[in-house]
Design a protein with these regions (language model features):
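Active-site histidine-anchored catalytic micro-motif
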Residues: 1-135
């Protein structure tokens, strides 16, 4: 089977790095694709998704601090005040590919899939689409 699955989550902070590896793996199981890749994407302009370090919790706090400091002195014209979130979303990206083999995510030993909230707290939708390999 191929297709797509969507799951939702509620972020709790303005800037938050959330490990969604388990939810993406569950989506892969629902999709029933043994080999190929998953396109993990967000229909949002103030959040991002990426693959990164999942083992050491200090990396999450380091990344959150670095993102908060990345654009503090830049003057933005957008009146809502969330232009830094839009910029960071575009810089990080709103989609990533995760290889699948034998129905399992193919990630490095320390890797995980992360949603990066940049303008929370909010409810976020994560779309997972199967891209299967032809046999």
């Amino acid at each position: 089977m191929s297709g797509s699955v969507e799951f939702r989550l509620r972020t709790t902070r303005k800037l938050e790095r959330r490990d969604i590896t388990e939810e993406v793996a569950k989506a892969a199981a629902k999709l029933g694709v043994a080999s190929g890749a998953l396109l993990v994407s967000l229909p949002h302009t103030t959040a991002a998704v990426t693959v990164g370090e999942a083992w050491d919790a200090d990396v999450t706090s380091d990344i959150e601090r670095a993102l908060a400091a990345w654009v503090p002195g830049v003057r933005f014209d957008h009146a809502e005040g969330n232009s830094p979130a839009h910029f960071l979303s575009e810089a990080i990206g709103v989609s990533c590919l995760v290889p699948l083999e034998k129905g399992k995510l193919v990630l490095g030993r320390w890797q995980g899939v992360f949603l990066i909230e940049l303008d929370g707290p909010r409810e976020r939708h994560v779309q997972v689409r199967a891209l299967k390999t032809e046999n």
